[in-house]
Curated annotation (Swiss-Prot):
Signal peptide segment: none
Organism: Clavibacter michiganensis subsp. michiganensis (strain NCPPB 382)
Record Pfam families: Ribosomal_L35p
Organism classification: Bacteria, Bacillati, Actinomycetota, Actinomycetes, Micrococcales
Name this protein carries in UniProt: Large ribosomal subunit protein bL35
Highest taxon of the lineage: Bacteria
Gene from which the chain derives: rpmI
Similarity comment text for this entry: Belongs to the bacterial ribosomal protein bL35 family.
Amino acid sequence: MPKQKTHSGAKKRFKVTGTGKIMKQQAGMRHNLEVKSSGRKARLNQDQPLAKADMKVAKKLLGR
């Protein structure tokens, strides 16, 4: 049986922490930034943990 390949799109979008949590980038930081407050942009710029409902699928795509 051949090796399982890591999903290319998933490896670009998700980071796995040392404890095994999967982090993703919050949406909303691509355009129209001039109308958003600096506080809002700071919040949006932080990595967010992936929802538990999506965790199983993401782990499979990442080969974990």
